[in-house]
Each structure stands twice: as C-alpha cells, then as structure tokens.
Regions:
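Alpha-helical transmembrane segments in inner-membrane proteins
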Residues: 1-338
Length: 338
C-alpha cells in the first residue's frame, strides 16, 4: 500500500515537473526566441508596447493555456468513454464523436460567416456539443445491437468518414473566404487562441472536470459491473447518461476551439494507468488531466518548432505519438485473450 501511494505521488510530481518544463519551453521557444530575462521583464509589466510583449502575452500564453486545458479535457473525455464502453480503445476521435462535432461546427460556421455574422465561442461550443451528441446517438444505437467492441469501433470510424465526407461536400460550395477559415480550423491547431477564448474554455472545462472527479466513486463501482454498482446504490441509467453528457461536453469544447485532435483520448488514459500502476478513478482522472496537458503541450511544441515558421497540424503530431500506443494496446489485448 505504501509503495503504491509513493508511486502515485512520484507520478504526480513527474507530470507536474514535465508540465512546468514544457510550459517554460512553450513561452520561450519559437520563431522568435525569448530569454528568461525577457519573459521576466514582460510579466513584470515593463515595455508593454514591444514586439516581445505581444508575442508572449497575446500569442504564446493563451496558446499554452489552451493546449493544457484542452489536452486535459480530451484525455478526461477519453477516460469517461472508456469507462462507459468498458473498453480501452474507445475515444471521441475513434468513435466519430469529434467528426460529428466538426461537421456541425462547419455547417454553423459557414452559415454565420456567409451572412457576415460573428461566430462567438458560445455558438462554437453549442454547435460542437450538438454534433457530438448526434454522433454519440448513432454510436449508442449501434452499441445496443452490436456486442463486439471491434465492430463498434469500425462503425465509429465509418461514422467519422461519413461526417468528413459531408463536411467536404459542404466546403465545396462555400465561399473562398469561408473555406480558408474552415480549413485552418479543421486541420487542428491551438494557434490563434485569444484570452477571451481561454476564459470561455476555462469556464467550461474546469467545472466539468470537477464534476467528473466527483464521480470517481460511482465510476469505481461501475468498473466492477453494473450489478455491483446497483448494489451500492448507484442509479446506473442516470450514471451512464452523466458519463455521456460530461464526455461530450469536454470533447465538444476541444473541437470547438482546436478542431479535431486525434488519439489523445485513447492513448493518454492508458499511459497514465501504466505510469501510476492503478486504475482507480480517484487517481486516474486527475492523472489523465495532467497527462493530457503534458501530451498536448509537447505535441504543440513539436508542431510549431520542428519546421518553423511552418506549423504542422496538432493531429499530425498526436497521431505520430498516440497511434503506436493504440497499436501496442490492441496487440497486448489480443495476446491476453489467448
């Protein structure tokens, strides 16, 4: 027991250390390098009219916070979905939930921009949430008829392709200016984040994460089976609805602000469980949030510095590091069944 507790404490300290290091690199490294002295002077309020102040305060700090918040949200969303479906390869990207959110956001974005209207953060989140719930509805209908998770995943991928195809069809008939805006968003990126957007995503992500953490005990009971959860007084029907609602809000918030981001929701929860050496939700949920923040900060740093000033899409980088984890999980799972 003491060894397990010590391991969890060390794991949390490691993630916090990596988070601080990556945050420091994120604000200092880029097309324009900023020294520690520059950052210290800017944060103290000196020389607010300088280019360095604009780069740090208006570009890098909001982007840093967005990557951390949305990375944590996506990882937590993945863990909730894996709990709901009782399978480690469930996630918002694989099940087509992110693509559904992307489709509805694209439709609303083209509608707003086509009429010369400003599309605020609230409209983006509501559109993404509607898309997430529609896709989740299709997945749940299929899940009732299909017992094999592999078939459900294939169906989720097909839903993702259908949503992407419809999105491409809609974009074909959109105005050129709308296509540029939609293309930049649909590639997946934390760039262009403003302080107003950071405030909105904080107001959405933090309360939903806290609610998810408060569900740690019923999640722990549910992981041992529905009958066991009922014996402890858990209203399973309401509990499952809450899981769907919370995971959809988190994934919708990510899609609304950063576009579709792949593999974070699948890979990070599994890596966190291995790192902490436990599957207890009271440990894994905050671990997932920290792990997702670290993973997305690292991926964002790679995406904007590897070929600077050209930026890669965030999904390209997360796929490179996340897909091998998923492959390893599937091979390991197949080997365990033999």
């Amino acid at each position: 027991m003491k060894n397990r507790r010590a391991r969890c404490q060390l794991a949390f300290l490691l993630l916090l250390f990596l988070l601080v290091i990556l945050a420091a690199l994120s604000v200092s490294v880029g097309s324009v390098s900023l020294s520690f002295q520059d950052i210290q002077a800017i944060l103290s309020g000196a020389d607010r009219e300088s280019t360095a102040f604009h780069i740090l305060w208006d570009i890098r700090l909001p982007r840093l916070l967005a990557a951390a918040l949305l990375g944590g949200a996506l990882s937590a969303s993945g863990f909730l979905l894996q709990t709901f479906f009782a399978n480690p390869i469930a996630g918002p990207f694989v099940l087509g939930i992110s693509s559904g959110a992307k489709l509805v956001v694209a439709l609303v974005m083209i509608l707003f921009l086509g009429k010369g209207l400003f599309m605020g953060s609230a409209a983006m989140i509501l559109a993404a949430f509607a898309g997430s719930m529609i896709s989740m509805g299709f997945v749940l209908v299929i899940a009732r008829r299909v017992r094999q998770m592999s078939v459900l995943v294939v169906c989720g991928v097909m839903i993702s392709y259908i949503c992407s195809a419809i999105t491409d069809f809609v974009v074909t008939f959109a105005d050129d200016s709308n296509i540029v805006n939609l293309h930049n968003w649909s590639m997946g990126s934390f760039s262009g984040t403003t302080w107003d957007q950071v405030r909105v995503m904080t107001a959405v992500v933090i309360p939903v994460f806290v609610l998810s953490f408060c569900m740690a005990k019923p999640i722990s009971a549910y992981q041992l089976g529905e009958e066991y959860a009922r014996s402890l007084g858990v209203n399973v029907k309401r509990f499952r609805a809450e899981l769907i609602l919370l995971s959809s809000i988190l994934s919708a918030c990510v899609t609304a602000f950063a576009g579709p981001v792949s593999f974070v929701g699948i890979a990070v929860p599994q890596l966190v469980k291995r790192l902490f050496g436990t599957a207890k939700p009271i440990v894994v949920i905050p671990g997932c949030f920290l792990g997702g923040a670290v993973f997305c900060l690292f991926s964002d740093l790679i995406s904007r510095t590897m070929f600077a000033p050209t930026e890669l899409s965030i999904s390209s980088v997360t796929a490179v590091f996340g897909a091998p984890v998923v492959i390893w999980m599937m091979i390991r799972r197949k080997g365990a069944q033999r």
